Structure formats: structure tokens, C-alpha cells
Amino acid sequence: MADTKVAMIVGGGSGMGAAAARKLAADGFAVAVLSSSGKGEALGKELGGIGFTGSNQSNEDLKRFVDLTMEKWGRVDALVNGAGHGPRAPLLEITDEQWHTGFDTYFMNVARATRLVAPIMVAQKKGAIVNISTAWVDEPTALFPTSAVARAGLAAYTKLFANQYAADNVRMNNVLPGWIDSLPALDERRDSVPMQRYGTSEEIAATIAFLASDGAAYITGQNLRVDGGLMRSV
């Protein structure tokens, strides 16, 4: 058990987060899965690990989740931060409350969990944090305004974190999915992708697993697009 690697997946009840939990478990990680729906609790138990029902917008829930993980395994090697869906509206119609909700959903989900888990990784002198972001960080779209703005902030946070903790062998990277099959399938969206298809949650999970692995030991502070060539910027 001392040699077992441990992964915590926050927001792992469905979609890309659940696929990441399954992939990491298949790669030999013991997994702890949190979601607000109860699906993460069921999945964690199905995979032989910990399942926890709680919110990534609650410091108390996150602390209990971390405490349960440490009580069982005594370490955390990987943290995967997923997110739900924030408000969408025409730009000038987004209220203060909606902006705050967007930042809670797409930025503070990472900041809260990282505050709790990073010190554990620093003490271990090893750890990897992978955040599920969006391909529209560099090319914002009015379709997802609060996501684009908050996750641009997440990109800056990731650089700051990477610079500060790289010497402790603790890494942070962002995965930037484009159109993924956990979203509604629309022909015009599919046709806008050079690969002419939606990506799969499993493809995102494979990228997350790579970034959490020793094969990515020299990668930190990066935003890795997994979008089928959708974004045109260099």
C-alpha cells in the first residue's frame, strides 16, 4: 500500500471527471472521487476507492474529502480539478452575482482544493495537479463568457503556482478541451473542428493521466489544448 499512488478527482461524477477517475484507476492509482450529485460517491466505491458527496464550492466539504483520503492512504499524488457549468448570458447582461458564481465555478474550485492539497504534495516533495479548463481561454467566445474570463485567470494562477512550487517537484497544468462528447452534439460545432468530430471524454482523461504521470515530470505551468485543431492561434 505504501507504493500505491493516490489520485483525488474533484468534480468526478460524470463526463470528463468520471472518465479521468476511471483512467487513473486503470493506470494503478487508488482514487478518491467527489461530486455534488452522488454519482462520484458511487463511482469511487465502484473503483475500489473513496466516494464522497460534497461541493467544490465548500471549503468544509473539501477539507473532509482530503482528510478522508489522508486517513485511508496517507498521501496524495495527483489532484484533478473539474468544474460544473457557470452562468451564460449576453456580456453586458451578466450580473455581479453571475460573475461571482462564474468565478466560484471555474476558478475558486481550483484555488480551494489546491490550498488543501498542495501542502501535502510539498511535504512529499512530489505531486501533480491537473485542472480541466477550456480551449476558449486564448480565443474567448460569447457562448461561454464567465468560463472564458475566469479560466484566463486560472491560466495566470497556474503560472504563479508552477513558478513557486516547481522546486518542490509539485506541478500544475491545465487541460483545454474543445468540443467534447459530454456536451450536446451540434453539426455546426462538429463541422468547425478540423478533425470533423467531437473529442471524447476518454481522450481528455488520457491527457489528464499523462500529465499526472512521471512521463510528464518536466511539464508544469502549461495549458495543453485537446481540441482537434479548433483553435487557430499559434
Regions found by a protein language model. Give the residues of each.
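Substrate-binding pocket helix/loop in short-chain dehydrogenase/reductase
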Residues: 65, 90-91, 95-103, 129, ...
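Short C-terminal tail/terminal secondary-structure segment
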Residues: 139, 209, 220-234
